[in-house]
C-alpha cells in the first residue's frame, strides 16, 4: 500500500526527476551554484513532465540498487555495496589508505550511528525511493521521518520547506561531473555541512563526525553512479572508496584552475595598448598571464602571443602590425623591445615638442614632428637602437616603392654624411588626420588626391614632389638614399628647393627631393618648422611663430592640403628621367618604340596607364602621340589577327562583391607541338576577378599531380604576399579540373569550385579572354623578334608582366595598382628579343672574348636581373651583366623597319640601368675569378686563333663586337651551334716546333686535357718556365731522353664532339700523323671516322728528373706539380686552393723513378679479353697479354661492333654465370638450391634458456648466467615493463596483439655474462607497429668524422652506456607478451607498458625518447641529415642504441652532460677519457688507442684473434704469411656446379659466415680489403671449391694482418681549414656481364675515414663512362660529409675530388649541352656539372700510380698493393 502511494506521487521517482534537472541547466554565463529559489518551479515542472513519461517503468532508476540500506544495521558502516562500489569498496588489510583526509578515518571502521535513520540513507529502489526533498543533516541526529507522509506535505516551489532541501540531480555523464559537483556542494551546504567541505587549499573549519562522513558517502554514491565518474575520481576511490572529500577538494581546485585559465585566455585575447601606461608595465602584465598559463601546462607560442598583442595595439604602436605581418618567426622579446622603443620615442618627443605645435587635445598624440633638425633624420626599426637616437618619422601613406631600383655605389653612400631617410609605416597618421582602420596602399587612387595641392604630412622628414617644374637649383642625386617603412628603396632623381610666396608677400624656401615614384606630393612639416612655420589644424591655416597667417590649408578626405599656387615655378627645362641630360628642345620618344617595349599593347591602354602613373619614369608628355591612334603595327596585325570579337560582359554580376584575390578564374592552354622536351607544352593562367591581376605557370603535361602543384603554389603565394584567402575558383569542366584529387584539395581548404555549365564557354569569358590575349601577344612577340618557338612561354611571361602593369579600358588602375604594388619601372624593361651582349665571367682563356651574344626575354622574377637567351649555348641565363647591342634591330625586313632606329631613345630610357651595367663591367677584373649572378654550368669554350710568333695577348673587349658588320639582325629560327663569330678552327701547326695539339671542339665545347701542350697555352708556357730551375725561353727538345717523362703511353682521349686528342705512341722518333675524327657527340674513348684532320704526335716516354723543365698542358690557373687539372669555381677562396694544397698531407705513396721501359701503367683502363678468360671473381687479367696490344682497346661502334659482339656473346654464353645459383643439369637441383638459400638462418651467437641454465654442465658458467637472469628480472620489474596488477587470459586477447618472448644469454667481449628478455619481433604482426618509424643509429662515417675532428682539436672522448635503454621508452600500441615458458604461465598474458627488446618499434621509440631528452634537457641539436649525431656549442654526441660517445674540448662539459643524463637514465661511464696518456677504447667493435695531441690507432686485433679461429677455417698460424689478399690473373671457372642439396646449403651457410665477418671488419677500418670482399660476396650463391679457396685465402690474410691498424696523426696546427677529399677510381669491364668496378676513398685532413667498393649498376661502354659513374657515386656523400664537418667544426672547409681520368675532368668542365650517345651517362655528366659548380668543389687530376683508390677496383700485385696502402694502414 505504501509502495503504491509512492508510485502515484510524481516526485517519488527521484532518478527521473534528477535527470530532468540536469537537462534544465542554467545558462552558460551563469554560475550553476547560483540557482535562486525562483528557478525551482521550472525544475519541478520539468521533473514532473519527465516523471510522468516514465511512470510505466518505475523500476528504471539512475541510482544503483543497494539492498544493504533497507534497514539500520548494527555492523560498521557503510557495508560493501553492489555494482562498482561493491568491487572497489572491498579493501584488504594489506591495502594502504592513501587518503589525504586521515582525520576523517575510514567509514568501514566506524560504529553504527543513528544517521541511518536519515531519509537520505534509505534504499533508492521502487519500494523505498529517495525523497525529492531531504531534511538537512544537523549536528544532532534527526528524528525518524515518515516517508509516506513526507512527500504529501512538501511544497513545490521552495528551496527549503521546513528542514527539507533540494537534492542534487543524478550524474548523467562523465563530461558533466564538474557541473554536478557544484550542485552537490550546494546540496551539502544547504544540509548544514558547509563548514566541513574543504576549500581549494584543502583547509576545513572543523572535523566531521562519523555520522556526517557516512551521510556524505551515501549521498555521493546515490547520486553519482560509479561507471559515470571520471578516471581520476575512480583512481582515488579505488584506493579509498570512502574518500569523498578528497574528490571534492580536487574538483574545487580544478574548477578554480579552469576559471583562472579562462580568465587568462580572455585577458590575453582582449589585450589593448596605446601607450597610456608604461611599456614595462604592459610587458609585465602580458608575461605574467603567459607564465600562469604555462604553469597550467598551456604553452603559448611566441607567434600566437605576438599576434594577440599586435591585434590590440593602437595609436603610434599600430605601426608594428604591418612590420610583423609577413614575419613567420616572430619573437615576443623583439616585439616588446619595439614597443619600448616607440614608447621612449614618444616620451622624448613630447618633452622636445615646441609650443607652436600645441594643438587640440584630439590630436595631441598624433603629431611626432621633430623641429630644429638641420640634417636629414635617420629613423630605423632596429630594436637594438639606443634611446638617444632621433625620433621616428611618421608614415607617408602614398609612397610607392620601386623594388627594381638597385643601389649604386653602396660604399660611397654608406660613407657619405647624408644619412638614409626612412619613411613611416602604413598605419600612422599625418598631423591632424583622423585614424582609419583601412590600410592605405602605396599607390592611392587619384580620387583621393586634391589636384594642384601638396599633402601636408607631419611624419615625412623630407618634402617629395613628383614634378621638377617647381624645383629650383636642381642637381642630380648621387648621395641621398630614401627607403620607406618596409625598408625598400625609393629612387631619388634630383635635389633642389621649393620657393613659396605666401599671401602677405612672405617668401621662404625649403629643401625638396624629386621622385616620380609617389602618388602624392608631400610637404614635410619638419621642413616648414625649420623656417618657423607651423600648421594650425583648429583654424586650418599655416602660421608663423608670431601668429601671422600665411596661407589657408584645406581638408580633403582624411588629409590636409596646401595649394600649389603659393609655389614659384622654376625657369629651367624639365628635369630629365634617370638623370640623363637633355637638350633645351626636349626629344620625345617615338610611339612605335614605347609600343614595342610595352609588349605591343594597344594605344588606349598605354595612354591611360601613363596618366594613372602605372608606368614610372615615363610620362604622357614624353611621347610623341601624333598618329599614334592610327598607327598600325605589322607584327600586331599578323600576330593578333582574329575572326570576330570575344563575347563581352559574360561573367556574373555577383562576382563584383568579392574582395581582391578571393575569386579567381583559371584555364589551361595547350599543347604546343614540335617543341624540345625541355620546353613547356602548356600553361595554366589565373586571373583575379577584382584586380584583374594575372599569373601564368608553365606545364609539361596535364596530369593531376602537375595541376595540383600549381594550385598549391598560387594559393600559398596569394596568402603570403597579399594576406588574402581564395574563396572561389571558376574553371571549365575539363578532366584536369573535375578529378577527385583536385576536388578533395578544394574541399580540404574550404574553396568553392565553380564550374561552367556544359557547352557554355561564354560563362568562362575572363579566363578565355586572357588566354587569347596572351597568345596574341606571344605570336606577335615571337614574330617581331624572330626568336625560336621553344621560347614561346618566355613571350607569354613577358606579356603577363606588361599586362599587369597597364590600365585596362574599363579600369581606373592597373592590376598592379589594384593589388597595392608599385608601378612598372620602365627603365627595367627591354623590348622582347632585344640583342644584348652578356659578360662571360669565366671564359676558357684570358685571351678569349668576354662577351656572348644574346637576346633579352623578360625581367627575372627571382632576382634583379634579366632573363637572356644565349643561342651559342642554347640556354637562358639570369644576369645583370649585359650591354644593349647598338645598331641591331630585330624587325622583319619585309616591313622596312630599317628606317626605325631607336638606339638613342632606348639609351635614354634605360640610362639608369646602363650606367649600372657599365659600372659593373669596368669594375670587374678580367684577370680574376669573380662571382657572377648568373649560373653557367661551366666556363664557356671559345676557340682562339692559332699560335703566332708573338706570345703576348690581351683580353678582348666585348664592346668591340659593334665594329664588326653584321648582316643578320634577327636570331635564326633554328640556332646553329656555330653561331659565335669566334669559333675559329685552329690553323696548321708550325712544323718547326713539335707541339702536342690540344684542340678544342667546336661542336660541343668539351675539352680533354692531357699531359701535352696546347698552342693556345704557349704564351703562358714560356713565362711560367722562366721561374723554374733550368728553364729557358726556348721550346723544349722533346727528343731529349734525360729530361721529361710525360707519363702518356698508348693513351687516346675523345671529347664530347668526337674530336680526338693526340694519339701518343711509344716510338723512338717524334712523328706527326693525321687521323680522321668523328663529330658525333660521345663520351666514348674509342676511335671513329671523321671528315676533319687532327695532328697526332707520338712521343717516347722519358724518365722524370729533378730540376728539369717539363711540358705543362694545363692553363696557368690549373697547373700543379702533379699535372692536376682542376675545375676551379668562381669562389673568393679559390685563388688559395691549388692542387698542391689538396694533395698535401694525403697518405699517397712515394714513387721512385722508373726506367723508360717501365710498363706498369701501360694497360690502364684497357678491358682485357683473354682467349681463356673466365669469370674472374677478382677481375684479374693475364700478365702475358698486357703488352700485346699496341692500339687502343676502346670499342668503336662503327669499326669493331661485330668483333665486340662476338667476344661479348662468348663471354656471356660460356663464362658469365657467377652471380646465379648453381645450375644443375637437373632442374630439381636448381630449385632445391634456391629453396635452400631461402631457408638459411643467420649465425646464432646467443644461447637459449635451456642451453645456458637448464642443461648447462659448466656449473661456474651456469651460476653466472643465473645471476644475470635474476638481474634482468629485477631490471624489468623496476622499469615497469608490463602491467603487474593483472594477468590476462589468453583466449580473451586478439592473437595479433600477442607477442612471443624468450630469454637469450651471451657472453660479452669484456667477459661479463648477459641475460636479456626479448620479444619475438620476427613474427610480429604488421598491424601492431608503424612501418614508417625508423630505428636510427649513428652512421659509421659520422663516427669516424667525429673521431678525426677530436684528434685534430685535442678533444676529450668519453664513452657511456645506458642500461636497459629500450625500457625507458613507452609503447603506444596495445600489446601482450607470453611469459617465459619456465614461469609456468602458459595460458596467461602480460600487458606491455615499455618497449621491450626485439619489438619492431622499440628502436624507434627509444630513439624518439632519447632524442627528445637530449634536445630539451641537454640543450643539444641533432645535425641535419646525420641522425644520432647531436651537438651544442661545447659537446658532440654520437649515439648507437645505448652507447654514447661524447667529444668535447672541455672535460667538464662532458661531465655536465653525464650529470643530466643520470637524472633520467641509469648511465654507466665506460671510459671518462681524462688521462693525458694513451687511452684504450672499445667503441662499437673498434679497438681504439688515443693519445690527445698526438695520434689515434684503430684496429680489431683482440676481436679477430678470438673470432677467426672459431670459423673452422684451416688457418696456418706458423706458415708463411700472405702479403696480399689476392693476385691478378686468378679466374673462377664457370663450369656447371653439380653438388648435393644439403652440401650446397652448408657451403652457402659457411660463405655467409666468412663474408659476413670480413664485411664487418672491412667497412669498419680495413678499407683495403673491400674490393675482394665485394667480389666474393657476389659469389655466395656459387660456393665452388675455387670460391671457397679464395675466401679462405682472404680470411688467412686477415689473420696474418690482424694486428694492422688504421693510423691517424694529428693534423698540422697551422692549417686554418678543414680539407675533405674524395679519391675516385674505376676499372672498366672487369666484372661479370661486362660490368665495371668502382671505388672511392674519403679523407678528412689527410686521414682516411671511409671507403666504398661496388659494382657499377649500369654497363659502361668506355673507361670514361666508368669513371663518371664512380665520380657520381662519390660527390653526394662528399657533400653530406662536408655538411657534417661544418656542423661539428666551424672552420672553413675545402672540398676536393681526385681522379686519374682526364676525360672525366674535361666533361665536368665542358659547357657543351648536346646530347650524349648514352642518355644514362649523359644525365650523370650533366648532374656532375651542376653539383661541382654549385658546391665549390675542386676537381684535380691524380696520377694512377698515386691513386690509392686503385685498391678498391682491381686486384693488384703485392708490390703495388703495399705501396698504395702502407701510408695509411700498417
Swiss-Prot record:
Mg(2+) 3 binds at residues 1625, 1667, 1700. Keywords: Aspartyl protease, ATP-binding, Cytoplasm, DNA integration, DNA recombination, DNA-binding, DNA-directed DNA polymerase, Endonuclease, Hydrolase, Magnesium, Metal-binding, Multifunctional enzyme, Nuclease, Nucleotide-binding, Nucleotidyltransferase, Nucleus, Protease, RNA-binding, RNA-directed DNA polymerase, Transferase, Transposable element, Transposition, Viral release from host cell, Virion maturation, Zinc, Zinc-finger. Initially, virus-like particles (VLPs) are composed of the structural unprocessed proteins Gag and Gag-Pol, and also contain the host initiator methionine tRNA (tRNA(i)-Met) which serves as a primer for minus-strand DNA synthesis, and a dimer of genomic Ty RNA. Processing of the polyproteins occurs within the particle and proceeds by an ordered pathway, called maturation. The active site is at 457 (for protease activity). It is found in: Cytoplasm; Nucleus. Gene3D superfamilies: Ribonuclease H-like superfamily/Ribonuclease H. InterPro entries: DNA/RNA_pol_sf, Integrase_cat-core, PolX-like_BBD, Retrotran_Ty1/copia-like, RNaseH-like_sf, RNaseH_sf, RVT_2, TYA. This is Transposon Ty2-GR1 Gag-Pol polyprotein. It comes from Saccharomyces cerevisiae (strain ATCC 204508 / S288c). The gene is TY2B-GR1.
Amino acid at each position: 500500500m505504501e509502495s503504491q502511494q509512492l508510485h502515484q506521487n510524481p516526485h517519488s521517482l527521484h532518478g527521473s526527476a534528477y535527470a530532468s534537472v540536469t537537462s534544465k541547466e542554467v545558462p552558460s554565463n551563469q554560475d550553476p551554484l547560483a540557482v535562486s529559489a525562483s528557478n525551482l518551479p521550472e525544475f519541478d515542472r520539468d521533473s514532473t513532465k519527465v516523471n510522468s513519461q516514465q511512470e510505466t517503468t518505475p523500476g528504471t532508476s539512475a541510482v544503483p540498487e543497494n539492498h544493504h540500506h533497507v534497514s539500520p544495521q548494527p555492523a560498521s558502516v557503510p557495508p560493501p555495496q553492489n555494482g562498482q562500489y561493491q568491487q572497489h569498496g572491498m579493501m584488504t588489510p594489506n591495502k594502504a589508505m592513501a587518503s589525504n583526509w586521515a582525520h576523517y578515518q575510514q567509514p568501514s571502521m566506524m560504529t553504527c550511528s543513528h544517521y541511518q535513520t536519515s531519509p537520505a540513507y534509505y534504499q533508492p529502489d521502487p519500494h523505498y525511493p529517495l525523497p525529492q526533498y531531504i531534511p538537512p543533516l544537523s549536528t544532532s541526529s534527526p528524528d525518524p521521518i515518515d516517508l509516506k507522509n513526507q512527500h504529501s506535505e512538501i511544497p513545490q516551489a521552495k528551496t527549503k520547506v521546513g528542514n527539507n532541501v533540494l537534492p542534487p540531480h543524478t550524474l548523467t555523464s562523465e563530461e558533466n561531473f564538474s557541473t554536478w559537483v557544484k550542485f552537490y556542494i550546494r546540496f551539502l551546504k544547504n544540509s548544514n555541512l558547509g563548514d566541513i567541505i574543504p576549500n581549494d587549499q584543502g583547509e576545513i573549519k572543523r572535523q566531521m563526525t562519523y555520522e556526517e562522513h557516512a551521510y556524505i558517502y551515501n549521498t555521493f554514491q546515490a547520486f553519482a553512479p560509479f561507471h559515470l565518474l571520471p578516471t581520476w575520481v575512480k583512481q582515488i576511490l579505488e584506493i579509498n572508496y570512502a574518500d569523498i572529500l578528497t574528490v571534492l577538494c580536487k574538483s574545487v581546485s580544478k574548477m578554480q584552475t579552469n576559471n583562472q585559465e579562462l580568465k587568462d585566455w580572455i585577458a590575453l585575447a582582449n589585450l589593448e595598448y596605446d601607450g597610456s601606461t608604461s611599456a614595462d608595465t604592459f610587458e609585465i602584465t602580458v608575461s605574467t598571464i603567459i607564465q600562469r598559463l604555462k604553469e597550467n601546462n598551456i604553452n603559448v607560442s611566441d607567434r600566437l602571443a605576438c599576434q594577440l598583442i599586435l591585434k590590440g595595439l593602437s595609436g603610434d604602436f599600430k605601426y608594428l602590425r604591418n612590420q610583423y605581418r609577413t614575419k613567420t618567426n616572430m619573437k615576443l622579446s623583439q616585439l616588446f623591445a619595439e614597443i619600448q622603443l616607440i614608447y621612449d620615442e614618444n616620451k622624448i618627443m613630447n618633452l622636445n615638442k615646441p609650443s607652436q605645435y600645441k594643438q587640440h587635445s584630439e590630436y595631441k598624440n598624433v603629431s611626432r614632428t621633430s623641429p630644429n633638425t638641420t640634417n636629414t633624420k635617420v629613423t630605423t626599426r632596429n630594436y637594438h637602437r639606443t634611446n638617444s637616437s632621433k625620433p621616428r618619422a611618421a608614415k607617408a601613406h602614398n609612397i610607392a616603392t620601386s623594388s627594381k631600383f638597385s643601389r649604386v655605389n653602396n660604399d660611397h653612400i654608406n660613407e657619405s654624411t647624408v644619412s638614409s631617410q626612412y619613411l613611416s609605416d602604413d598605419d600612422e597618421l599625418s598631423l591632424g588626420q583622423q585614424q582609419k582602420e583601412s590600410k592605405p596602399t602605396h599607390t592611392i587612387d587619384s580620387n583621393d588626391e586634391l589636384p594642384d595641392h601638396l599633402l601636408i604630412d607631419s611624419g615625412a622628414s623630407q618634402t617629395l614632389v613628383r614634378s621638377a617644374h617647381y624645383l629650383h637649383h636642381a642637381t642630380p642625386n648621387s648621395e641621398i638614399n630614401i627607403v620607406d617603412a618596409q625598408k625598400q628603396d625609393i629612387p631619388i632623381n634630383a635635389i633642389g628647393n621649393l620657393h613659396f610666396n605666401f599671401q602677405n608677400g612672405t617668401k621662404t624656401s625649403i629643401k625638396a627631393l624629386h621622385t616620380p615614384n609617389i602618388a602624392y606630393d608631400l610637404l614635410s612639416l619638419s621642413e616648414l618648422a625649420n623656417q618657423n612655420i607651423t600648421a594650425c589644424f583648429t583654424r586650418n591655416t599655416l602660421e608663423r611663430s608670431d601668429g601671422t597667417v600665411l596661407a589657408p590649408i584645406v581638408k580633403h578626405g582624411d588629409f590636409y592640403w596646401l595649394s600649389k599656387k603659393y609655389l614659384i615655378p622654376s625657369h629651367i627645362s624639365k628635369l630629365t628621367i634617370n638623370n640623363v641630360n637633355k637638350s633645351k628642345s626636349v626629344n620625345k620618344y617615338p610611339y612605335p618604340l614605347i609600343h614595342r617595349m610595352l609588349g605591343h599593347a594597344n594605344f588606349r591602354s598605354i595612354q591611360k596607364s601613363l596618366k594613372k602613373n602605372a608606368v614610372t619614369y615615363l610620362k604622357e608628355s614624353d611621347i610623341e602621340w601624333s598618329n599614334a591612334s592610327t598607327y598600325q603595327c605589322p607584327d600586331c596585325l599578323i600576330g593578333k589577327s582574329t575572326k570576330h570579337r570575344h563575347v563581352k560582359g559574360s561573367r556574373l554580376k555577383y562576382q563584383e562583391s568579392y574582395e581582391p584575390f578571393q575569386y579567381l578564374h583559371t584555364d589551361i592552354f595547350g599543347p604546343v607541338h614540335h617543341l624540345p622536351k625541355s620546353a613547356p607544352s602548356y600553361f595554366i593562367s589565373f586571373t583575379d576577378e577584382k584586380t584583374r591581376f594575372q599569373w601564368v605557370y608553365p606545364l609539361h603535361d596535364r596530369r593531376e599531380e602537375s595541376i595540383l602543384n600549381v594550385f598549391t603554389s598560387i594559393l600559398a603565394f596569394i596568402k603570403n604576399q597579399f594576406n588574402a584567402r581564395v574563396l572561389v575558383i571558376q574553371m571549365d569542366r575539363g578532366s584536369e579540373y573535375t578529378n577527385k584529387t583536385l576536388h578533395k584539395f578544394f574541399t580540404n581548404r574550404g574553396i568553392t569550385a565553380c564550374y561552367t555549365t556544359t557547352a557554355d564557354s561564354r560563362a568562362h569569358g575572363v579566363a578565355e579572354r586572357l588566354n587569347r590575349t596572351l597568345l596574341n601577344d606571344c605570336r606577335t612577340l615571337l614574330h617581331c623578334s624572330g626568336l625560336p618557338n621553344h621560347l614561346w612561354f618566355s613571350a607569354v611571361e613577358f606579356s603577363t608582366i606588361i599586362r599587369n602593369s597597364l590600365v585596362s579600358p574599363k579600369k581606373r588602375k592597373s592590376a598592379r595598382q589594384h593589388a597595392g604594388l608599385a608601378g612598372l619601372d620602365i627603365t627595367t624593361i627591354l623590348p622582347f628579343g632585344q640583342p644584348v651582349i652578356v659578360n662571360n665571367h669565366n671564359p676558357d682563356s684570358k685571351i678569349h672574348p668576354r662577351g656572348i651574344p644574346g637576346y633579352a626575354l623578360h625581367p627575372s622574377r627571382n632576382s634583379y636581373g634579366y632573363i637572356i637567351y644565349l643561342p651559342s649555348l642554347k640556354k637562358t641565363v639570369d644576369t645583370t651583366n649585359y650591354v644593349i647591342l647598338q645598331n641591331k634591330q630585330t624587325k622583319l625586313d619585309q616591313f622596312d623597319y630599317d628606317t626605325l632606329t631607336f638606339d638613342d631613345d632606348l639609351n635614354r630610357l634605360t640610362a639608369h640601368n646602363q650606367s649600372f651595367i657599365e659600372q659593373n663591367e669596368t669594375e670587374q677584373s678580367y684577370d680574376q675569378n669573380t662571382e657572377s649572378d648568373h649560373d653557367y654550368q661551366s666556363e664557356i669554350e671559345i676557340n682562339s686563333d692559332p699560335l703566332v710568333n708573338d706570345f703576348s695577348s690581351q683580353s678582348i673587349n666585348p664592346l668591340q663586337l659593334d665594329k664588326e658588320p653584321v648582316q643578320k639582325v634577327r636570331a635564326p629560327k633554328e640556332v646553329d651551334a656555330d653561331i659565335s663569330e669566334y669559333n675559329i678552327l685552329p690553323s696548321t701547326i708550325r712544323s718547326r716546333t713539335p707541339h702536342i695539339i690540344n684542340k678544342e671542339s667546336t661542336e660541343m665545347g668539351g675539352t680533354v686535357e692531357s699531359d701535352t701542350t696546347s698552342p693556345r697555352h704557349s704564351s703562358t708556357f714560356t713565362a711560367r718556365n722562366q721561374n723554374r730551375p733550368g728553364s729557358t725561353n726556348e721550346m723544349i727538345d722533346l727528343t731529349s731522353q734525360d729530361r721529361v717523362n710525360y707519363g702518356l703511353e698508348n693513351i687516346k682521349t675523345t671529347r664530347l664532339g668526337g674530336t680526338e686528342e693526340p694519339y701518343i705512341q711509344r716510338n723512338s722518333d717524334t712523328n706527326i700523323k693525321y687521323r680522321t675524327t668523328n663529330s658525333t657527340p660521345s663520351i666514348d674513348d674509342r676511335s671513329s671516322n671523321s671528315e676533319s684532320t687532327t695532328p697526332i704526335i707520338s712521343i717516347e716516354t722519358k724518365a722524370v728528373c729533378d730540376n728539369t723543365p717539363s711540358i705543362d698542358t694545363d692553363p696557368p690557373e690549373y697547373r700543379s706539380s702533379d699535372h692536376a687539372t682542376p675545375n676551379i669555381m668562381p669562389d673568393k677562396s679559390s685563388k688559395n686552393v691549388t692542387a698542391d694544397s689538396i694533395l698535401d698531407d694525403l697518405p699517397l705513396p712515394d714513387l721512385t723513378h722508373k726506367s723508360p721501359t717501365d710498363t706498369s701503367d701501360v694497360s690502364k683502363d684497357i678491358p682485357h679479353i683473354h682467349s681463356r678468360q673466365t669469370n674472374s671473381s677478382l677481375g684479374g687479367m693475364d700478365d702475358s697479354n698486357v703488352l700485346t696490344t699496341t692500339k687502343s682497346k676502346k670499342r668503336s661502334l662503327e669499326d669493331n661492333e661485330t668483333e665486340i659482339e662476338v667476344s661479348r656473346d662468348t663471354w656471356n654464353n660460356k663464362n658469365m654465370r657467377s652471380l646465379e645459383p648453381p645450375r644443375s643439369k637437373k632442374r630439381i637441383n636448381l630449385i632445391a638450391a634456391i629453396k635452400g638459400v631461402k631457408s638459411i638462418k643467420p649465425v646464432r651467437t646467443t644461447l637459449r634458456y635451456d642451453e645456458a641454465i637448464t642443461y648447462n654442465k659448466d656449473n661456474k658458467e651456469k651460476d653466472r648466467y643465473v645471476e644475470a637472469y635474476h638481474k634482468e628480472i629485477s631490471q624489468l620489474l623496476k622499469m615497469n615493463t608490463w602491467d603487474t596488477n593483472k594477468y590476462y587470459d589468453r583466449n580473451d586477447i586478439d592473437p595479433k596483439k600477442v607477442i612471443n618472448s624468450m630469454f637469450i644469454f651471451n657472453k660479452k667481449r669484456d667477459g661479463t655474462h648477459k641475460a636479456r628478455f626479448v620479444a619475438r619481433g620476427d613474427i610480429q604482426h604488421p598491424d601492431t607497429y608503424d612501418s614508417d618509424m625508423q630505428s636510427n643509429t649513428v652512421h659509421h662515417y659520422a663516427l669516424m668524422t667525429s673521431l678525426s675532428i677530436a684528434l685534430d682539436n685535442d678533444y676529450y672522448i668519453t664513452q657511456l652506456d645506458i642500461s636497459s635503454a629500450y625500457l625507458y621508452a613507452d609503447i603506444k600500441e596495445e600489446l601482450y607478451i607470453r611469459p617465459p615458458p619456465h614461469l609456468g604461465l602458459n595460458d596467461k598474458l602480460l600487458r606491455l607498458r615499455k618497449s621491450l627488446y626485439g619489438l619492431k618499434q622499440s628502436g624507434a621509440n627509444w630513439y624518439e625518447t632519447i632524442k627528445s631528452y637530449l634536445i630539451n634537457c641537454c640543450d643539444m641539436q641533432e645535425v641535419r641529415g646525420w641522425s644520432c649525431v647531436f651537438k651544442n656549442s661545447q659537446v658532440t654526441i654520437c649515439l648507437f642504441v645505448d652507447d654514447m660517445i661524447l667529444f668535447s674540448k672541455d672535460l667538464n662539459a662532458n661531465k655536465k652532460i653525464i650529470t643530466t643524463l643520470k637524472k633520467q637514465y641509469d648511465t654507466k661511464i665506460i671510459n671518462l677519457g681524462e688521462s693525458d696518456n694513451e687511452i684504450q677504447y672499445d667503441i662499437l667493435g673498434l679497438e681504439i688507442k688515443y693519445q690527445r695531441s698526438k695520434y689515434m690507432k684503430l684496429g680489431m686485433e683482440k676481436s679477430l684473434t678470438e673470432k677467426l679461429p672459431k670459423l673452422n677455417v684451416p688457418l696456418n698460424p706458423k706458415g708463411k704469411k700472405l702479403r696480399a689478399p689476392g693476385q691478378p690473373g686468378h679466374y673462377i671457372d664457370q663450369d656447371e656446379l653439380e653438388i648435393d642439396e644439403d652440401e650446397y646449403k652448408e657451403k652457402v651457410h659457411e660463405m655467409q659466415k666468412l663474408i659476413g665477418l670480413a664485411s664487418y671488419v672491412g667497412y669498419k677500418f680495413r678499407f683495403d680489403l673491400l674490393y675482394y670482399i665485394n667480389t666474393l660476396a657476389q659469389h655466395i650463391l656459387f660456393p665452388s671449391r675455387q670460391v671457397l679457396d679464395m675466401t679462405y685465402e682472404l680470411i688467412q690474410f686477415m689473420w696474418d694482418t690482424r694486428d694492422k691498424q688504421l693510423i691517424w696523426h694529428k693534423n698540422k696546427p697551422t692549417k686554418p681549414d678543414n680539407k675533405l677529399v674524395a679519391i675516385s677510381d674505376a676499372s672498366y669491364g672487369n666484372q661479370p656481364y661486362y660490368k665495371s668496378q668502382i671505388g672511392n676513398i674519403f679523407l678528412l685532413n689527410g686521414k682516411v675515414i671511409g671507403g666504398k667498393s661496388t659494382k657499377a649498376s649500369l654497363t659502361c661502354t668506355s673507361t670514361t663512362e666508368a669513371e663518371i659513374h664512380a665520380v657520381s657515386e662519390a660527390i653526394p656523400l662528399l657533400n653530406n660529409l662536408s655538411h657534417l664537418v661544418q656542423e661539428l667544426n666551424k672552420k672553413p672547409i675545402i672540398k676536393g675530388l681526385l681522379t686519374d681520368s682526364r676525360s672525366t675532368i674535361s666533361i665536368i668542365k665542358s659547357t657543351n649541352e648536346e646530347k650524349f650517345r648514352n642518355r644514362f651517362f649523359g644525365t650523370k655528366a650533366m648532374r656532375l656539372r651542376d653539383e661541382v659548380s654549385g658546391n665549390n668543389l675542386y676537381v684535380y687530376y691524380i696520377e694512377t700510380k698515386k691513386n690509392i683508390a686503385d685498391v678498391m677496383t682491381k686486384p693488384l700485385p703485392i708490390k703495388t698493393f703495399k705501396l698504395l696502402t702502407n701510408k695509411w694502414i700498417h
